Design a protein with these regions (language model features):
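Extracytoplasmic gate region of multi-pass secondary transporters
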Residues: 154-214, 280-284, 288
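Paired small-residue
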Residues: 17-25, 268-275
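Cytoplasmic helix-loop-helix junction between adjacent transmembrane helices
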Residues: 22-59
């Protein structure tokens, strides 16, 4: 909601200070998206499937990064040809309006599984399968068996909260570094301006590779089905595997040397960085899902929000 207000009010920005204020509103509005999404995932999926479902919607940000550079300029040029301002104002209005429609759908259509008439008995039984699974009631949870609610300040009393905090603090910077540094790297090292077809193709391939993270979210489910491990242990094993892949980024610059590997050596760092980014997103999907293993559903959004704050600080 607040994010959509930002998009629409951007057309009224006439100074840097207004822009900063608008960005603050956007940040406040965006901050609730992931905590809410993780909580919905915990309500609609059993523990073994949560990382996979999280990796799917987590990939949505990558899809948006691929589509936005194509859609927004096209909208702006269309409205400019129609004589509606400079074009970009209406682009903000259209995107903001779509956001309000999306918000309305969530407000009026979302219901918990046991209250949703579109969820049948078999689906509800699958969603609630963890209730009867004693193996999943591990000592890792900081709450009593009735899963009482925990206040926001009380969350900081538990070591599990700090594990999520430092996990996000130490890793989110990697993703944002790859995301924002890659275009500058392509421009500085290989001389491709961001508006050239080659640069756009490289960025497209980079983002497309990161979407492999969807399969990374499936790995814990595979481990559970093959080994019989509980979801928490399976996620820890998967996260360890994913944590090793970003080390490949150490080879990105040496393999991108044009003098050694030819004029098209730029494909090596692009592919390597894409794989590292996909591994990070897979790791991130699992740490979000771990929150649901350690805390009751009523507290998941707060813990994920704390982790998101840590990632933002990094």
């Amino acid at each position: 909601g607040l994010g959509d207000v930002y998009k629409r009010q951007t057309i009224a920005i006439t100074s840097v200070y207004y822009f900063i204020a608008a960005r603050i509103i956007l940040g406040i509005g965006e901050a609730g998206n992931f905590p809410a999404a993780i909580k919905v995932t915990a309500e609609y999926f059993p523990k073994k499937d949560r990382a996979f479902s999280t990796s799917i919607f987590n990939a949505g940000s990558t899809i948006g990064a691929l589509i936005a550079p194509l859609c927004i300029p096209t909208l702006a040029r269309y409205f400019q040809r129609m004589g509606v301002g400079n074009g970009w104002e209406m682009a903000f209005i259209v995107i903001g309006g779509l956001g309000f429609i999306w918000m309305g759908l969530w407000i009026f259509m979302y219901k918990k599984p046991d209250e949703n008439p579109h969820v049948n008995a078999a689906e509800l039984a699958y969603i609630e399968q963890d209730k009867d699974n004693e193996e999943d009631k591990k000592a890792t949870t900081p709450t009593t068996k009735d899963e009482k609610s925990i206040s926001f300040l009380q969350c900081f009393k538990y070591p599990q909260t700090w594990a999520v905090f430092f996990g996000k603090f130490m890793t989110d910077g990697v993703w944002w570094f790859f995301l924002f540094w890659a275009p500058a790297y392509i421009s500085d090292v290989y001389g491709f301006s961001s508006d050239t077809p080659t640069a756009q193709m490289l960025i497209f391939v980079l983002y497309a590779i990161t979407m492999l993270s969807v399969y990374g979210g499936k790995l814990p489910t595979i481990i559970i089905n093959k080994t019989g491990k509980n979801p928490y242990a399976a996620r820890m094993q998967a996260m360890f595997i994913f944590a090793l892949f970003p080390l490949l980024a150490l080879f990105a610059q040496p393999l991108g040397n044009k003098e050694v590997f030819g004029e098209q050596a730029y494909w090596f760092p692009i592919i390597i960085i894409g794989i590292a980014g996909a591994a990070h997103q897979s790791w991130s999907a699992n740490i979000y899902s771990v929150v649901g293993d350690m805390f009751p559903k009523s507290t998941i959004a707060a813990i994920v929000g704390i982790g998101g704050m840590a990632g933002g600080i990094s």
